[in-house]
């Protein structure tokens, strides 16, 4: 099975893990600081806090911003954690529709802010598939209305926007180190920022809100959590980060092949990355034309049967039964249509061009046999 994404674990990772496992300290040690420093250097920020998941990172980012009982404006086209973490932090969530590239529509965001901005606690955007949002426009809106901006860059480590690394431009930015993401620490995440005060608050909450006066004496000054990432996981993260740019080049080779082969086909469109952006290529989404919406499940199953691991990114968050109970029925046209159209096909550094050609040939072969049928 050629999976839609895949971790890259080689002997250097195994060696790094083995060495870390032999250390006296397995958690709360020097490797945590080293990983945070490496992330800061790579992304181009001053401060970082690594945690046990991106969900934890989101939760503490929202909490540090003090968004309780306020509204978080976010995208529905994301993993549920983007909104869930805001609710856990005591906020309300409101979804803004997307554009045809899967990213939040900055014009619709502006229209919502013009309507009323006094109750907004944060704007939380997602760089879908590794393709940066229009950060200039969104950042300007956040500054104009004096609203904190969170960039959920879980897909986008290594991505760039106008020459700057994604993760260096918002008040707080989030990264994920789940195995399908650009680098992995098994599970893990991080918050990065140039705001020392916010990161200090997040680091305090990461470990129970406890500060140590002396080795044997501590004080709990906040109600915190156990969201720590182990030294063993950080050792893997440090080594993974060293390989990231090389792995992104390999992903780009696969996507360049797809872009060329899929141009002007009769079945689907692809997402074009603008010249002033660089994507991590976490995902390679294809967007079926409307006449194939009804056949998407058939296509999905046929591809799996052929050994091609596909996935759908994402069911809009407001479509989950929990959110229907919470918010009622919501219809956002672009997000609805994107969900009907989207399939993520294999694209990762473990593939070669032979694999990509197999995916392309199989995809077209199956689509040729699928009957068109408009289904709304």
Curated annotation (Swiss-Prot):
Key word Transferase present: yes
GO biological process: polysaccharide biosynthetic process
Keywords attached to this entry: Aminotransferase, Pyridoxal phosphate, Transferase
Modified residues (N6-(pyridoxal phosphate)lysine): 181
Keyword set includes Transferase: yes
Gene3D superfamilies per the UniProt record, alphabetical: Aspartate Aminotransferase, domain 1, Type I PLP-dependent aspartate aminotransferase-like (Major domain)
EC category name: transferase
A molecular-function term among this protein's GO annotations: transaminase activity
EC numbers for this chain: 2.6.1.92
Binding residues annotated for substrate, in chain numbering: 4, 24-27, 54, 176, 226, 311-314
InterPro entries, sorted: DegT/StrS_aminotransferase, PseC, PyrdxlP-dep_Trfase, PyrdxlP-dep_Trfase_major, PyrdxlP-dep_Trfase_small
Reactions mediated catalytically: UDP-4-amino-4,6-dideoxy-N-acetyl-beta-L-altrosamine + 2-oxoglutarate = UDP-2-acetamido-2,6-dideoxy-beta-L-arabino-hex-4-ulose + L-glutamate
Its biological purpose: Catalyzes the second step in the biosynthesis of pseudaminic acid, a sialic-acid-like sugar that is used to modify flagellin. Uses UDP-2-acetamido-2,6-dideoxy-beta-L-arabino-4-hexulose as substrate producing UDP-4-amino-4,6-dideoxy-beta-L-AltNAc.
Family recorded in the similarity comment: Belongs to the DegT/DnrJ/EryC1 family.
Protein name per Swiss-Prot or TrEMBL: UDP-4-amino-4,6-dideoxy-N-acetyl-beta-L-altrosamine transaminase
Organism of origin: Campylobacter jejuni subsp. jejuni serotype O:23/36 (strain 81-176)
């Amino acid at each position: 099975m050629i999976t839609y994404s895949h971790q890259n674990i080689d002997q250097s990772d195994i060696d790094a893990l083995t060495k870390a496992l032999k250390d006296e300290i397995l958690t709360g040690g020097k490797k945590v600081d080293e990983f945070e420093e490496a992330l800061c250097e790579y992304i181009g920020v001053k401060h970082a806090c690594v945690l046990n998941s991106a969900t934890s990172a989101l939760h503490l980012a929202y909490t540090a911003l003090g968004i309780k009982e306020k509204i978080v404006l976010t995208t529905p086209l994301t993993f549920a954690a983007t909104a869930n973490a805001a609710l856990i932090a005591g906020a309300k969530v409101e979804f803004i529709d997307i554009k045809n590239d899967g990213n939040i529509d900055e014009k619709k965001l502006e229209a919502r802010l013009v309507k009323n901005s006094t109750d907004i606690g944060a704007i939380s955007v997602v760089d879908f598939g590794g393709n940066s949002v229009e950060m200039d426009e969104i950042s300007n809106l956040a500054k104009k209305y004096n609203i904190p901006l969170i960039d959920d860059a879980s897909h986008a480590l290594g991505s760039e926007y106008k020459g700057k690394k994604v993760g260096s431009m918002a008040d707080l930015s989030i990264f994920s180190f789940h195995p399908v993401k650009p680098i992995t620490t098994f599970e893990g995440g991080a918050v990065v920022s140039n705001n020392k005060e916010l990161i200090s608050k997040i680091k305090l909450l990461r470990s129970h809100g406890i500060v140590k006066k002396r080795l044997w004496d501590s004080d709990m000054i906040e109600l915190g959590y156990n969201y720590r990432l182990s030294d063993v996981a950080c050792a893997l993260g440090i080594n993974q980060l060293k390989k990231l740019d090389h792995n992104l080049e390999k992903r780009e080779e696969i996507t360049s092949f797809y872009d060329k082969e899929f141009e002007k086909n009769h079945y689907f469109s692809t997402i074009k990355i603008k010249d002033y952006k660089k994507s991590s290529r976490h995902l390679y989404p294809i967007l079926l034309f409307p006449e194939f919406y009804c056949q998407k499940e058939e296509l999905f199953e046929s591809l799996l049967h052929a050994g091609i691991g596909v996935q759908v990114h994402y069911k809009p968050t407001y479509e989950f039964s929990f959110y229907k109970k919470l918010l009622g029925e919501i219809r956002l046209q672009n997000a609805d249509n994107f969900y009907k159209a989207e399939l993520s096909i294999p694209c990762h550094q473990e593939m070669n061009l032979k694999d990509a050609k197999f995916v392309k040939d199989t995809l077209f072969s199956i689509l040729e046999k699928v009957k068109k049928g408009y289904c709304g």
